[in-house]
């Protein structure tokens, strides 16, 4: 079963959406509909960034930086985001695709996120490279969880120091 592909009901009912998704400022993921509201991950119109957990994590870091800077009366440097998606093909065999993203102009003079440094696995890659990609895919989730919950996480420690 594939769930409805839209922003959550709360975002739509709150007037944050245009159609099924929420428009955001690419440099911050701040809503274009409501000041001091940030929308990230699947709910955001993050043209041309894919909707993935990796993307949402990258966006969340930026949103946290903006919220902290706003509370401290500071500014945040230039935005950059990253995405990687892995596909597991068999034990010890995986492929990946990804890119870096920065705010900019897209075709049709639309504001969005412009991809750079794109990468994609190639047909015929050596087994060692596919194994390394497989290992990378499995390392990502524990790394993410460690970043979020680690006691020595500098970002979390800084946030606790302000409370």
Where are these regions (language model features)?
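FAD-binding beta-loop-beta segment adjacent to the flavin cofactor pocket
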Residues: 20-38, 90-111
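C-terminal auxiliary extensions adjacent to catalytic cores
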Residues: 97-163
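Glycine-rich beta-alpha junction loops
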Residues: 3-6, 89-93
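FAD-site-proximal beta/loop scaffold in flavoenzymes
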Residues: 1-58, 69
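Solvent-exposed, non-transmembrane amphipathic alpha-helical segments
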Residues: 12, 57-60, 80, 87, ...
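Broad hydrophobic/π-residue packing in well-ordered secondary structure
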Residues: 1-2, 34-38, 62, 70, ...
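Noncatalytic linker/hinge segments flanking ATPase motor cores
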Residues: 16-18, 22, 38-46, 76-86, ...
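A conserved FAD-binding loop/helix module that cradles the flavin
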Residues: 43-83, 87-89, 96-98
């Amino acid at each position: 079963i594939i769930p409805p592909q839209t922003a959550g009901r709360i975002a739509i009912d709150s007037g944050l959406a245009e159609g099924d998704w929420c428009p955001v400022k690419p440099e911050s993921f701040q809503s274009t509909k409501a000041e001091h509201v940030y929308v990230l991950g699947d709910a955001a119109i993050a043209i041309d960034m894919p909707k993935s957990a990796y993307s949402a994590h990258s966006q969340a870091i930026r949103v946290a930086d903006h919220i902290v800077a706003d509370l401290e009366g500071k500014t945040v440097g230039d935005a950059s985001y990253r995405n990687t998606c892995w596909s597991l093909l068999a034990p010890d065999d995986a492929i990946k695709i990804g890119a870096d993203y920065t705010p900019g102009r897209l075709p049709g003079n639309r504001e969005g996120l412009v991809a750079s440094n794109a990468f994609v696995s190639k047909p015929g890659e050596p087994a060692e490279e596919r194994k390394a990609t497989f290992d990378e895919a499995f390392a990502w989730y524990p790394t993410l969880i460690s970043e979020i919950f680690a006691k020595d996480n500098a970002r979390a420690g800084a946030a606790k120091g302000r409370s």
